[in-house]
Amino acid sequence: MRAIFTLVLSLAGVPVLSASPLKINGSTTVNLPVAEAAEILRAEQKLDIQVDTQGGSAGGISMLGDGQVQVGMSSKPVSLEDRLKYPKCDFHPVHIGEDAVALIVSKDVWENGIRALSKAQIKDIYEGRVKNWKELGGVKPQRIAFFNKEPGRGTWEVFVHWLYGSPKAAPQVNFPEVGGNEETRTKVASTPGALSQLSASWADGRSVFALALIGEDGAPVSPETQNIASHKYPLSRPLFILTNGEPAGGAKVLVDFLLGDRGQALVQKHGYLPLKALHP
């Protein structure tokens, strides 16, 4: 009888929820709206959801590829290399919103007069040629304390792709590494002279500050909503939910919620651009 009922639901287009939990892993950036959506779906639909951020975007892609989770979260597109590495996984990306990677500094750097950097200046810092903020227009001498995002995380890949054209072209560097967004913001806020890459929505303007990027025309472009939506800001990036094939069962319930009005409101609540802001 249960099998017949399940078949009827399936034929009617109603997602059939598995008794096993829906496991989700990946980006700490995408996690914010997803974790809140999961709370709502647990309460309203009794959906058993487990959300983790182990390994960031790279972890979400690899665990989905290995079949350890049913849903991955990623702040970078799935690459051809990822697809070749996991040939049994039919990566299906669902675009849920837009974000940007910002170069953030500690309060003392901001107060030292650093408000914008060019690509050439950032490359000089990353490659170790410039080590003091005064060389970049700071009012007083101050050592640059750079924290590098862990290679493989979506934030790092977007950053080095912009800086070098490809993650593979990025040089090996010897900076302290940071993982998730909370860790990055805490490290930068508590370290004099600090600089790192971070999701723009996490730059609170109190403890850490997002720098503008100086374009080829010499004009600074800040990671503000209109610049991210128009891609005038060069480090704009899409946010994805990933499934193996078309979303089904609990994964479809989650995806449908995130693409609906309530889910898109959560995307916006956490500082990201909802889809309607990209296609008004």
Question: Which residues make up each language-model segment?
Answer:
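Bacterial N-terminal signal peptides
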Residues: R2-P15
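Exported/periplasmic ABC-transporter solute-binding proteins
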Residues: S18-P87, F91-P280
